[in-house]
């Protein structure tokens, strides 16, 4: 098994940190500090070495330290391709982000070729009651760990969708170019939908096989394209192309693309109660979310032979002793780099004995 882990992390003008340098190894790491000390900021900085905008989905302008125009995150990381240096820089004035791998520029969506990462934060606990976009992005992040090309597919699909919307809005009479764009979107849609379905099959198997202290869930996706594939629809690309063509007038009026894989919803049911997670209690929703993360970790390692970096923000809070103990045993048994935030060590004393402790002062 190959482990993805950080050897070092450097922050410059990042959030509340002027300068911070951490040296780490392939072990559990506990960030200890009061609220406001920057624990979650460190996890967010690490998450930027994975496709997307990090675990907060923050705007670039919010990431740089107040009064500073630019900031930097640098990591020496044991990647899928070996030891490498990664940097990501932000410039507030130009609203630009530049990411580099061994001093060569790479696209953000290429990061899944090098890294693998899973995170769980308090903000995610509302994912079952929020909009479908949040759940869909959550599912796609899971897919990244099974298929490193998925992030690039999603990014390109969104780009061509933007181009299509622009052509329709500006009334550019170029049917040829519009046809090419829609054909590209259809081809990518087919791959995206198939990747999601394949990953859900893996995940469901992992959930059903893994016996733990958390409720089992039934996973599915509510989307026209995905359902057509499940129904055995032939020539799915032609079907999508035809739908995009037929909705041109409607989409011109709406100012957006009304059909496609960007409209799909990730559905989660409490298996025993047979009700959607959004109708469960907040405690049950958190437990179901943890169960999904456990399944993702377990099956990603089993299938890809790669252990991702795991980021857990205040996850042990409000868990009973039994569930807390199970999580600690599960995660330490995986022999991977795990980052945990906590205000104190109460309830995780035994875990702390096996971890690297990093104490953070409050930075005023």
Swiss-Prot record:
SUPFAM superfamilies (UniProt xref): P-loop containing nucleoside triphosphate hydrolases
Gene3D superfamilies referenced in this protein's UniProt entry, alphabetically: P-loop containing nucleotide triphosphate hydrolases, RecF/RecN/SMC, N-terminal domain
Taxonomy of the source species: Bacteria, Pseudomonadati, Pseudomonadota, Alphaproteobacteria, Rickettsiales
GO biological process: DNA replication; DNA synthesis involved in DNA repair; double-strand break repair; SOS response
Cross-referenced Pfam families: SMC_N (PF02463)
PROSITE patterns the UniProt entry points to: RECF_1 (PS00617), RECF_2 (PS00618)
Lineage top rank: taxon: Bacteria
Cited InterPro entries: DNA-binding_RecF, DNA-binding_RecF_CS, P-loop_NTPase, RecF/RecN/SMC_N, RecF_2
Protein name per its UniProtKB record: DNA replication and repair protein RecF
């Amino acid at each position: 098994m190959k482990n993805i882990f950080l050897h070092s992390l450097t922050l410059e003008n990042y959030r509340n940190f002027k300068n911070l340098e951490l040296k780490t190894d392939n072990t559990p790491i506990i960030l200890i500090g009061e609220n406001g000390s920057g624990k979650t900021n460190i996890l967010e900085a690490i998450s930027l070495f994975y496709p997307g905008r990090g675990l907060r989905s923050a705007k670039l302008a919010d990431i740089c330290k107040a009064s500073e125009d630019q900031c930097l995150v640098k990591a020496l990381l044991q990647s899928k391709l070996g030891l490498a240096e990664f940097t990501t820089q932000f410039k507030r004035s130009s609203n630009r982000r530049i990411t580099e791998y061994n001093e060569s520029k790479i696209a953000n969506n290429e990061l899944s070729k090098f890294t693998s990462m899973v995170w769980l934060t308090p903000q995610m606990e509302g994912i079952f009651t929020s909009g479908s976009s949040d759940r869909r992005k959550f599912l796609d992040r899971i897919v990244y760990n099974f298929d490193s090309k998925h992030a690039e597919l999603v990014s390109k699909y969104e780009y061509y969708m933007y181009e299509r919307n622009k052509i329709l809005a500006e009334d550019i009479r170029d049917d040829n170019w519009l046809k090419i764009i829609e054909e590209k979107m259809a081809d990518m849609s087919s791959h995206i939908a198939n990747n999601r379905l394949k990953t859900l099959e893996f995940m469901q198997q992992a959930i059903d096989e893994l016996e733990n202290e958390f409720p089992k869930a039934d996973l599915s996706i509510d989307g026209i394209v995905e359902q057509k594939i499940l129904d055995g629809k032939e020539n799915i690309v032609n079907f999508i192309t035809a739908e995009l063509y037929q909705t041109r007038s409607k989409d011109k009026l709406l100012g957006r693309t009304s059909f496609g894989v960007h409209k799909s919803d990730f559905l989660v049911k409490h298996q025993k109660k047979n009700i959607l997670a959004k109708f469960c209690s907040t405690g049950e929703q958190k437990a179901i979310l943890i169960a999904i993360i456990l399944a993702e970790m377990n099956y990603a390692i089993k299938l890809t032979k790669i252990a991702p970096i795991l980021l857990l923000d205040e996850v042990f809070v409000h868990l009973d002793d039994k569930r807390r103990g199970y999580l600690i045993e599960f995660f330490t048994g995986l022999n991977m780099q795990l980052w945990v935030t906590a205000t104190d060590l109460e309830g995780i004393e035994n875990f702390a004995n096996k971890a690297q402790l990093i104490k953070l002062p409050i930075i005023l």
